[in-house]
A protein has these predicted regions:
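Classical protein tyrosine phosphatase
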Residues: 84-86, 92-94, 192-197, 201-203, ...
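Conserved cytochrome P450 K-helix/beta-meander segment immediately N-terminal to the heme-binding cysteine loop
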Residues: 395-422
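C-terminal helix/juxtamembrane-tail motif
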Residues: 2-3, 262, 482-496
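Cytochrome P450 heme-binding "Cys pocket" and the immediately downstream C-terminal segment
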Residues: 322-324, 444-482
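N-terminal membrane-proximal hinge/A-helix region immediately C-terminal to the signal-anchor transmembrane segment
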Residues: 2-119, 126, 130, 152-160, ...
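Cytochrome P450 heme-thiolate "Cys pocket" and heme-binding signature region
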Residues: 137, 297, 302, 421-451, ...
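Conserved cytochrome P450 K-helix E-x-x-R motif and the immediately C-terminal K′/meander segment
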Residues: 47-70, 342-384, 394, 404
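Cytochrome P450 heme-thiolate monooxygenase catalytic core
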Residues: 103-115, 146-309, 327
């Protein structure tokens, strides 16, 4: 009898929760008169992502393609209303013109329960602004130039380790190889550690890199779209093992990159040859050890996954388009002959390579969606929508980059899209691989250089062809937030 009563109470409670969820929480856009995509309980419009059917980039790409004529439309991420911006002028409004009302990403950040979440990418409001001012001088072209020799050495080691494979005209899996190269680069530039992942693919540095990006779509969805849930239940997004690893090995204390040490000791970064203007009054607000560790952590996250996936996609496309591969190789040869060796200026003068990397990020944007949250209520210009504080905003970058109205024949790999005249003819917010506005990626220069050096190191010595095991087109892994290929990318490598 008691069991029957408990079951009855459970069913009634579940029914009440369902009704409240569906007819109250998921009724927001209908009440506001905004066109919306019909949601389901309990994930809203994220069901296909949290169940592993689509990547988050594909989910919002598909919604954009279907509903872009509405300019803006409503969706639900779990119980939260989410306004998707499909109009380029409105995207500029959110990212730049009305930045004061949309300055936060709305993703999980709680330094008390997860100290390593207190980094530049996630921090809100004033904390973000103060840290951005401190960190901006660490990513000037002058500072990247100072790091160039480290990057070059990693690239040379990278190419050298593939010599035997090339001589045998063997098949290589480039997704893993570029991940190991990226690990070596980040560990060298951020921590002063020679990780040797190219020689030792299963060492502890590669192990922890894999662990950070292990597949967990449900938690990724909470991080991006429902941070309040993680906050309420005190769920740290960063695996505690990663924190313990840093503490046990004293990586931050003894091997931390020099620029962050300056921020800890002085509160500002010393000026380089670009005559950076530093706010020396900030010396009273030096970075703490935990704050510095958080910045090192995001440096690894941002530099590792985005650059390695971009390089992977790029070489995949070049293996299919031998004419483009040959044209890049010709440019590399010309620049090396002109400069005598690989230099910072030589890489920057490789204009065709730059177009190829840009086209790669157009077709495969590393971060396929941009998130913002409304921090100050406002009327969205040229619409009848009043955006209330706390409303999540999503910009479907992957959808924009594959829109045939913006990029004709969007599935075609065509570096000429980034000729100066083509760029000038497009809306400036039609290409967003690094975001835009005040919260544009601070490490854009570093990301470009890391990717280009990896490609130059390989293409100057080797040729690449597609292996029959690699599908055309590629399919995407459903779990990661970054647009990642599913399975391996197998290419045949041979000497020039």
């Amino acid at each position: 009898m008691l069991l029957a009563e408990l079951i009855g109470i459970f069913i009634i409670t579940l029914s009440v929760v369902y009704i409240y969820y569906k007819y109250v929480l998921l009724n927001y856009w209908r009440k506001k008169g905004v066109f919306y995509v019909e949601p389901t309980v309990p994930a809203g419009n994220l069901t296909s992502y949290v169940t592993g059917k689509l990547s988050v980039g594909e989910l919002f790409r598909d919604a954009y393609m279907k509903y872009k004529d509405h300019r803006v439309f409503g969706m639900y991420t779990f119980f939260k209303p989410n306004l998707v911006i499909a109009d380029l002028d409105l995207i500029r409004t959110v990212l730049t013109k009305e930045f004061a009302s949309f300055h936060d990403r709305g993703m999980f950040c709680n330094e008390k329960i997860d100290p390593l979440s207190g980094h530049l990418f996630l921090l809100p409001g004033k904390k973000w602004r103060n840290l951005r001012v401190k960190l901006t001088p660490t990513f000037t072209s002058g500072k990247i130039k100072q790091m160039f020799m480290i990057l070059k050495e990693c690239g040379e080691e990278f190419a050298k380790n593939l010599e035997n494979k090339a001589q045998m005209r063997d098949c290589i899996e480039i997704k893993d190889i570029f991940a190991r190269y990226s690990t070596d680069i980040i560990m060298s530039t951020a921590f002063g550690i020679k990780s040797n992942c190219m020689k030792e693919p299963n060492n502890e540095f590669r192990h922890w890199g894999k662990k950070i990006f292990e597949e967990r779509p449900f938690w990724n969805a909470l991080l991006m779209f429902a941070p309040q849930v993680m906050d309420f239940f005190s769920i740290p997004f960063t695996d505690r093992d990663n924190v313990e690893y840093r503490q046990t090995h004293n990586i931050v204390r003894h091997d931390f990159m020099n620029l962050l040490i300056q921020l800890m000791e002085k509160g500002y970064v010393e000026a380089d040859d670009e005559k950076d203007v530093n706010d020396e009054s900030s010396t009273v607000n030096k970075l703490t050890m935990l704050e510095a560790a958080a910045q090192a952590y995001v440096f690894f996250l941002a530099g590792f996954e985005t650059s390695s996936t971009t390089a992977t996609y790029c070489l995949y496309e070049l293996a299919q388009h031998q004419d483009i591969q040959d044209k890049i190789r010709q440019e590399i040869d010309e620049m090396l002959k002109q400069h005598g060796k690989l230099t910072y200026n030589a890489v920057n003068e490789m204009t065709y390579l730059h177009k190829v990397v840009n086209e790669t990020m157009r077709k495969y944007p590393p971060v396929p969606v941009l998130n913002r949250v409304c921090t100050k209520e406002l009327d969205l210009p040229t619409t009848n929508i009043r955006v209330t504080e706390g409303t999540l905003i999503t910009i479907p970058v992957f959808g924009l980059h594959r829109d045939p109205a913006i990029y004709p024949h969007p599935d075609k790999f065509d570096p000429e899209r980034f000729n100066a005249d083509k760029i000038a003819a497009r809306h400036p917010y039609a290409y967003l691989p690094f975001g835009e506005g005040p919260r544009i990626c601070i490490g854009t220069r570093f990301g470009y250089m890391q990717t280009k050096i990896g490609l130059v190191s390989l293409l100057s010595k080797y040729k690449f062809k597609l292996h029959p095991r690699t599908p055309i087109p590629l399919t995407f892994d459903e779990a990661p937030i970054v647009l990642t290929v599913k399975g391996g990318v197998h290419l045949i490598i041979e000497p020039r």
